Amino acid sequence: MNLIQQIEAEEMAAAGKDIPEFRAGDTVRVGVKVTEGNRERIQNFEGVCIARSNRGMGSNFTVRKMSFGEGVERVFPLYAPIVDSITVVRRGVVRRAKLYYLRGRTGKSARIAERRDNRPTKGEKADA
């Protein structure tokens, strides 16, 4: 590991963010810090993750949602201070890393099937 990677790893550890495992196709709820005047509150932005870029401290992800019939996309830096929390609402089955094709689709063709993991979780044993 060179010096730049080492410094970046230290910064990511110092950020202390609890980032769940998610990928393109998953529906995520992002808690965004919004400042209104002198008070700060958390505003949730829920939508489908259509892209994810893993570049250390420069990692980001794009979330797309439909708001009053209009598509809204937002790019969130993963380690930005405005991102308060990330929650995975549901997992989706997709065969692409980038889902930009969803921009041109509406209705049923824009739906993503839910991924069901049949593997046992860490705490429970598999039935044999």
Swiss-Prot record:
Gene3D superfamilies: 2.30.30.790. GO terms for biological process: translation. It comes from the Bacteria. GO terms for molecular function: structural constituent of ribosome. Signal peptide: none annotated. One of its GO terms (cellular component) is cytosolic large ribosomal subunit. Keywords: Ribonucleoprotein, Ribosomal protein. InterPro entries: Ribosomal_bL19, Ribosomal_bL19_CS, Ribosomal_bL19_sf, Translation_prot_SH3-like_sf. Belongs to the bacterial ribosomal protein bL19 family. This protein is located at the 30S-50S ribosomal subunit interface and may play a role in the structure and function of the aminoacyl-tRNA binding site. This is Large ribosomal subunit protein bL19.
